[in-house]
Amino acid sequence: MSIEKVSILGKESIHVGYGIQSHIVEETIKCLASSTYVIISDTNMSKTPTYEKLQDSFQKELAKQRPQSRLLTYLIPPGENHKNRETKAEVEDFLLQQGCTRDTVILAVGGGVIGDMIGFVAATFMRGVRVVQVPTTLLSMVDSSVGGKTAIDTELGKNFIGAFHQPEFVFCDVSFLQTLPKRQLINGMAEVVKTAAIWDETEFTRLEGFAKRFLAEISAPTPNLESIKDELIKTVLGSVRVKAFVVSADEKEGGLRNLLNFGHTIGHAIEAILTPEALHGECVSIGMIKEAELSRYLGILPPSAVARLSKCLAAYGLPISVDEKIFSKIIGAKKNNLKIDSLIKKMLIDKKNDGSKIRCVLLESIGKCYESKAHQIFKEDIQVVMTDEVFVHPFANRHPESVSITPPGSKSISNRALILAALGEGTTRIKNLLHSDDTKHMLDAVVLMKGATVSFEDSGDTVVVQGHGGKLFACKEEIYLGNAGTASRFLTAVAALVNSTQDEKSVTLTGNARMQERPIAALVDALTTNGSKVDYLNKQGSLPLKIEAGNGFKGGRIELAATTSSQYVSAILMCAPYAEKEVTLSLVGGKPISQLYIDMTIAMMKDFGVDVTKSETEEYTYHIPKAVYQNPQEYVVESDASSATYPLAFAALTNSSCTIPNIGSSSLQGDARFAVDVLKPMGCTVEQTSKSTTVTGPPIGTLKALPEIDMEPMTDAFLTASVVAAVSQGTTTISGIANQRVKECNRIKAMVDELAKFGVSADETEDGISIHGVQLKDLKTPGGRGVKTYDDHRVAMSFSLLAGLCKDPVLIQERSTTGKTWPGWWDVLHSKFNAKLEGHEYIRQRSGSLRNGDRSIVIIGMRAAGKTTLSRWLAEHLNFKLLDLDQYLEKKLAVDIKLLVKEKGWDYFREKETEVLNECLEKFGKGHILATGGGIVEGEKPREALKNYTKSGGIVLHLHRDLKETVNFLSKDPTRPAYSDDIEEVWKRREKWYHECSNYHFYSTHCTSEAEFANLKLVFAKFVSKITGDDTFVLPATRSTFVTLTYPDLRKVPSLIKDVSETSNAVELRVDLLANQETAYIAEQIGLLRSVATDLPILYTVRTKSQCGQYPDEDEEGMRKLLMFGLKMGVDIIDLQLISSPSTIAEVISKRGHTKIIASHHDFTGDLKWDNVEWKNKYAQGVSIDADFVKLVGMAKTFDDNLLLENFRRQNTEKPLIGINMGPQGKLSRVLNKVLTPVTHELITDKPIGVGQLSLKEINQALFQIGGLLEKEFWVVGFPVSHSRSPALHNAAYAALGLPYKFDIFETDDAEKVYTQLMQKPTFGGLAVTIPLKLDIKKYCTELSESAKLIGAVNTVTPIADGRKGFLGDNTDWIGIANSFKKADFALASGVTNGLVVGGGGTSRAAIFALHSLGCQKIYLLNRTESKLQDLVDSFPDYDLEILLEKNASSVSIGLVVSCVPGDKALDETLMKKLDGVLSNNKGDKQTRPLLLEAAYKPRVTPIMELAKEKYDWTVIPGVEMLVNQGEAQFKLHTGYTAPYKVIHSAVLNE
């Protein structure tokens, strides 16, 4: 057994080896005499063979060596969330109960959680007992176990309470690592890499070489760490020795020890937010990169060192960005919580800080820290590094007069050098290689295909490539290239040379979304013509590509169009020496694009030993011999000439000087001519030698435009030229840059669009751009979201220059895109040019949470699904124009569709239909309802267009109804072209397409009567308001409830649904309890529920068996689909179980649209008490995924469980909590819960037994009994009021809901009496105000609602904050009028309706307000005394009011009438004559159904009602309906509850 010992604080107490359990036992018992030894571990570790062996060995050895001593064991739950005060106290209580004394020795066997917390127990128990650390994870071996730092976590951060307490021994048994999962092993490597990065470059280099073997071994199906145990021991020792040395020099972290916190300032802040999903090492890895970038930003660390650190961490499988795909999946929706303000708050309370000053370790090079101490860092600098958007402040006069800048290596040369070196034989040292995203992808690809071995020297500045002579092999992994265009083209050709292996027969190249749009077809065609087999895996002509291995490169004559990209030409040139036959490459069809880059490739091939000869007989033709590249010993990459244009342009724009010391006239790069050919003619002074270039800008404002310049030799530099031209005098026209339209973006269009934001106009030309320069003083500061960079590095860098010339800071989006060619550009701008930068965090709104506004809505669905009718309703509701795409097509082609199909067939029709769809989406993108034909989804192209529309935030609404009804309808309709297939078969074929092409779905219930159609229109309008964001669920300020429906089929209980749900704030549909979970059935059930409970929000729940439901837990995919279908149905609230997979949670959260989310967790075992940390974790999880509510349900086994829950509720207030206990003993929790309490109803007979459900009435009664509800008094006031039905209405509702309230009569005409005798009472609850007090009471109201102000009368008074802040005067008369019309099927009225108000009194004002709210375009007024009407017209200047004259009475169109004249008095003859004319002219029929509401409720039938109904067949609404409806609204204002409508209606009618 080999054991390495490391000294710390003068004692060899750290022992490292493999399989040293017996040594641990012997050494502990021999050296640490004690009466009691206590092994403390966690429940996971205790199940491992290594732990069991350790415990057994200890027991046996102790019996031999110290038989009088005893061994105790204690296990705690695993995980960081148990590293807290509570768990520490439990351990201490155990030790005390066992009679442990000060001679106790504790062995902490476990990872960092055990080591930290048990070390802290040892530090404080009996004022300090001895502790032995036995770390069992790689992370704890190299980090937490060494150095004596012990601690527990608090809510404010990690390790905030602890002590320095040195262990007697630290035993690092590497064999323990065999028990760890892969992710935990990788997690530990972060601290290993960190230690080498701050202290030992030699060890760092060893780690770079070990990464591949390490990852391969731990990724094996059955890992065997013994095969790499020597390397693992070296790895642990390397870190432990550094830490031991540092701790010995600075035990209490006074200075030097702070260096060990590299990566932790930012890493700990990230971890505090992402724990427990993200592991410590993962967060520290990301922290290291961010702190390295901070060092680079401050001008301390070279870019190559950042690149090297990134590559090393990534090689071990560690995340280097929170945006990495796998890491993002792990942390799920918690990623949304990584706000810069939150992170900085966490950093501000870091233990390393000096007061409130943030301190951070800065890296100077790999293996060395800057000044060997932590430094104070400004929040502003951290903000720049941590955000991907930046404000560039005005350059003003902060910049230096002259500066020398060395840009990174040329991207073009770097990529070519890597390809040539990988294909070559021998070892070459490449210096000044560009360390960027592009070259990183290239290096990774070369290594994956085994084309070369890559290592680093000179702190990463030198890349050592050992080429394998063109021997490349297929690999299992996809080769991901991001948006690296150069790499994709070169590697496509290289992949054609790849050999197959026994297991792998192909290579797959892929990239990001933009890369998958960029063209590569011309190169692929050339390769396939030459024998390669290449398949497009997605879009034809773009990546991803699958290239079959083993076909090789045939060679011979290859022709490429001269107009093709020079990168295609270079790709074939570089691979040509490895063809089976010598290659002749001919560029045909004119002068080649970017000839200079072709010349560059040929020159570089010569540097690597292959001479390309130009044909003497054919123009633009090259002969390439068969050969193997011979790698030169050293190759120095020239700085990137395209990148050099930015600092040179800075000098031009700011009247300063800039020198590029390593690019001159001898450069191979076309862009090296930028200074001489572009900046010099614009007025700059240019000095250029063969190796250097210096530019001095003219006085500010004197740059001259270039009337015409051909930039074909330096196309990438046109963007830089454009921003200089923007502030030059005159118009600059650039040509020869057509290829820039197919780069990272359409750069010419991007330049035109973004220049416009600066007030600079520019025009696209056939092969270029014209820019009309402006005076500097006329340059505008872009507003809103600033400059869009299109994920294009050159767009970002170019506009960073123009931004600094504006008067105010300019926002640049996606600044990290510069990583493609110049990762440190912003650092140079900041540290070399002294530009002030300010990091900006863009808080993205929830996906779909923006209101739809005027964006057009597309309708799809089967023929006869109701698209025509519902589309018309939709257009009316949104005030959009309706465009039927079939009619548009008929008009465009001047032919009937039925005839078109008959003559030219369905295929032709589908083709034209697709053209029309694309045209209409482009042309009518705003303010339209685009109704499509049923078969629009038949073609792939229209499906793609519809899906893209939803991805861009547009609404595609799928309308559907019962299929049998559709079949019945179509079989009777001869006007439509006949289906060639059975209708049901057509539906089966299309169903999946409708679902994938739409983001919303509406199911129309079958209607057989006008009332049902009216209700459907109302339901549909509410649905549309929800999905467009105009009417979303808002939690009431008062107590709220939802009623649960557990019926398998709602069709059997429609009337019951309305009665049991109307007093709740939402209704829960338990999807898991439905008869089946087919989406068609669920849609039908939701359609029915909406038609019955019209006004109630729907809570959509799929509960699994483990969460007290019926849905199978194992069907995760089925659950995901059901949840996504709920979102598609536009439900108001969705229940999302916290036990769902992170991917399901993330998808639901990201696609929630306007639906609110309840994050739920149920424990029906009762094992989890409310003081258990697991509940806190579940609540925190709900908060972290940004749910709107968190619902936690326990099981009460004792009455005290309710009190524990209330304590939990008080402590957790970040999100509204629905917290209840199930069971009979949990009823109190339902009474005390205020937010969306689940309730049952007296009418529900089959209630679940033993759950403890209560009705709303029972909750209120119990709440009153325990003092949660107090008695209140309400009155109707006025004169006369003795016959008022208000007391009957309100008291009936109080009784139904169990409210301890009383409503009475107070008859008076004196408002002061009301105020002094009623409103001042402590039990005052509110008033119903009638004549003559509706005006007088206003002076006693502190506030008036908008309706009360406009109507000018108050009929409802409620106290504000129990009267302490005064009283609110409101008016519900208008609601009574409006709701009476709505309940009388007003929704069926088509188009805009005009209204008429009869009378000129106070109620008339409420009637006008109501009719306006219903959308009446014009409101006519009719009264015996016309002077009163003029007052009304003057009071509502914004409403279109018109006094109805006798001559017009018989001709105006009117659909709604409100009679506001006394019902018990004879009417004026003139008035009756006018009214008779109106009623006669607008007689009722099936289409119009005009409505008349009588405001007077005595007598029951008034003369006006009789006239309208009997003589002219108008639908009349008696006054009692208005009384009930306004009383219902009044009740809601008084109590916060919805009154049971049947109850109050009966109470009013039963006199």
Swiss-Prot record:
Location of region: Shikimate dehydrogenase: 1271-1551
Protein's cellular compartments: Cytoplasm
Involved pathway(s): Metabolic intermediate biosynthesis; chorismate biosynthesis; chorismate from D-erythrose 4-phosphate and phosphoenolpyruvate: step 2/7; Metabolic intermediate biosynthesis; chorismate biosynthesis; chorismate from D-erythrose 4-phosphate and phosphoenolpyruvate: step 3/7; Metabolic intermediate biosynthesis; chorismate biosynthesis; chorismate from D-erythrose 4-phosphate and phosphoenolpyruvate: step 4/7; Metabolic intermediate biosynthesis; chorismate biosynthesis; chorismate from D-erythrose 4-phosphate and phosphoenolpyruvate: step 5/7
Region listing for 3-dehydroquinase, in residue ranges: 1045-1258
Annotated cofactor note: Binds 2 Zn(2+) ions per subunit.
Catalytic activity: 7-phospho-2-dehydro-3-deoxy-D-arabino-heptonate = 3-dehydroquinate + phosphate; 3-dehydroquinate = 3-dehydroshikimate + H2O; shikimate + NADP(+) = 3-dehydroshikimate + NADPH + H(+); shikimate + ATP = 3-phosphoshikimate + ADP + H(+)
PROSITE patterns for the chain: EPSP_SYNTHASE_1, EPSP_SYNTHASE_2, SHIKIMATE_KINASE
Binding site for Zn(2+): E191, H264, H280
NCBIfam families: aroA (TIGR01356), aroB (TIGR01357), aroD (TIGR01093), Shik-DH-AROM (TIGR01809)
Family membership noted in the UniProt record: In the N-terminal section; belongs to the sugar phosphate cyclases superfamily. Dehydroquinate synthase family.
Protein role: The AROM polypeptide catalyzes 5 consecutive enzymatic reactions in prechorismate polyaromatic amino acid biosynthesis.
Protein name per Swiss-Prot or TrEMBL: Pentafunctional AROM polypeptide 2
